[in-house]
């Protein structure tokens, strides 16, 4: 690992991450209970993430399916902490491959895909590969990197169906999760009451938090530019989530994706999208379907929606160990009355 990358990662661990939030995850200990400072091994991979982030969930699930030990560094990205806005963390992401490859974020579409949104240096997750010195900051790219770099564990990206799997991964990656989280259904808010209560004004709080960090960017034009782009994005988001036509379009797109998924499941000869082989596509859909369920949008496939294949598929996904450990049972996940039945069966 390059000394520069090591320094950047260490500064985030030491200056941003709370000691109790820096842990070691291993195949035989998949909950964040072993403090990093008490661990006897230095992991190759180090993940900076947040419990509730769908992008973080995809990467955690991939790491668990591959059966590797990794360092877990949890940031609190909600106001008022907004630890992901700290200069040390933003500088780490600005040194990533995604920062060099993608245009800066400057709009809001309701998705979290870098391909559609542009690169946002103030979000999670970020993966550091201590062996190669590479910094990766786009969840889809991180998962593909792990699939290609690691031969052990589940073969999530089989060579003979690689392109077909990638097509499904891309579809799941374009789901407008962010819009459905921050914005209400104009025809009746389906989100958990606890979430409804904290959402009004949240983008203004995020913008204020960014502005409080701007003085810390003095003498660092790249960091200052990152903060400025973030403000533009959050201003656009604040307008988007109260725009009824845009919200209806986002909800309609999400439901259509589930309809298309049901069609694709009908072509499979096994329990997963590609027969008996559990792939990265299934993992990405697990994250999407669980978020829909959590938010109250399970009507996309239940309650007379006529999509029994998706309903059965979702049940299988939610029972998979990596999905339970990386998403459903990860400590600190916000509560929702829509998933109590899954937690009670854990």
From Swiss-Prot:
One of its GO terms (biological process) is catabolic process. It catalyses: 2,5-dichlorohydroquinone + 2 glutathione = chlorohydroquinone + glutathione disulfide + chloride + H(+); chlorohydroquinone + 2 glutathione = hydroquinone + glutathione disulfide + chloride + H(+). Its EC number is 2.5.1.-. GO terms for molecular function: transferase activity. The keyword Magnesium does not apply. PROSITE patterns: GST_CTER, GST_NTER. InterPro entries: Glutathione-S-Trfase_C-like, Glutathione-S-Trfase_C_sf, Glutathione_S-Trfase_N, Thioredoxin-like_sf. Induction: By 2,5-dichlorohydroquinone. Pfam families: GST_C_2, GST_N_2. Residues 189-335 form the GST C-terminal domain. Keywords: Aromatic hydrocarbons catabolism, Detoxification, Plasmid, Transferase. It comes from the Bacteria. Residues 43-154 form the GST N-terminal domain. Pathway: Xenobiotic degradation; gamma-hexachlorocyclohexane degradation. The keyword DNA repair does not apply. Catalyzes the degradation of 2,5-dichlorohydroquinone (2,5-DCHQ) into hydroquinone (HQ) via chlorohydroquinone (CHQ). Is involved in the degradation pathway that allows S.japonicum UT26 to grow on gamma-hexachlorocyclohexane (gamma-HCH or lindane) as the sole source of carbon and energy. However, the conversion of CHQ to HQ by LinD seems not to be essential for this degradation pathway, because the conversion rate of CHQ to HQ is much lower than that of 2,5-DCHQ to CHQ. CHQ is more efficiently degraded by LinE in strain UT26. The mechanism of this reaction probably involves a glutathione transfer: the halogen is firstly removed through substitution with glutathione, which is then removed by displacement of the aromatic moiety by a second glutathione molecule, producing oxidized glutathione (GS-SG). Belongs to the GST superfamily. This is 2,5-dichlorohydroquinone reductive dechlorinase. It comes from Sphingobium indicum (strain DSM 16413 / CCM 7287 / MTCC 6362 / UT26 / NBRC 101211 / UT26S).
């Amino acid at each position: 690992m390059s000394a520069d990358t090591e320094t950047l990662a260490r500064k985030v661990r030491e200056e941003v991450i709370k000691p109790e939030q820096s842990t070691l995850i291993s195949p035989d200990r998949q909950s964040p209970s072993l403090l990093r400072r008490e661990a006897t091994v230095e992991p190759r991979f180090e993940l900076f993430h947040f419990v509730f982030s769908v992008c973080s969930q995809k990467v955690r699930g991939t790491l668990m399916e591959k059966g590797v030990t990794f360092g877990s560094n949890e940031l609190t990205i909600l106001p008022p902490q907004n630890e992901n806005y700290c200069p040390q963390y933003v500088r780490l992401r600005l040194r990533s491959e995604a920062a060099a490859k993608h245009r800066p974020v400057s709009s809001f579409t309701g998705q979290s895909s870098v391909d559609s949104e542009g690169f946002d240096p103030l979000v999670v997750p970020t993966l550091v590969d201590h062996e190669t010195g590479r910094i990766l900051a786009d969840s889809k790219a991180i998962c593909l990197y792990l699939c290609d770099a690691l031969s052990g564990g589940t073969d999530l990206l089989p060579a003979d169906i690689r392109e077909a799997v990638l097509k499904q991964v891309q579809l799941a990656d374009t789901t407008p999760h962010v819009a459905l989280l921050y914005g209400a259904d104009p025809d009746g808010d389906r989100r958990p009451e606890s979430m409804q209560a904290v959402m009004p004004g949240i983008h203004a709080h995020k913008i204020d938090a960014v502005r409080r960090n701007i003085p810390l960017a003095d003498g660092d034009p790249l960091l200052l530019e990152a903060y400025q782009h973030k403000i533009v994005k959050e201003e656009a988001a604040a307008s988007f989530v109260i725009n009824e036509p845009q919200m209806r379009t986002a909800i309609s797109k999400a439901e259509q994706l589930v309809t298309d998924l049901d069609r694709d499941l009908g072509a499979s000869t096994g329990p997963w999208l590609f027969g008996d082989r559990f792939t990265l596509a299934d993992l990405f859909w697990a994250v999407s379907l669980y978020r829909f369920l959590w938010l109250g949008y399970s009507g996309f496939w239940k309650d007379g929606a006529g999509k029994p294949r998706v309903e059965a598929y979702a049940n299988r996904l939610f029972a998979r160990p990596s999905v339970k450990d990386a998403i459903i049972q990860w400590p600190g996940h916000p509560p929702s009355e829509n998933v109590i039945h899954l937690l009670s069966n854990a």
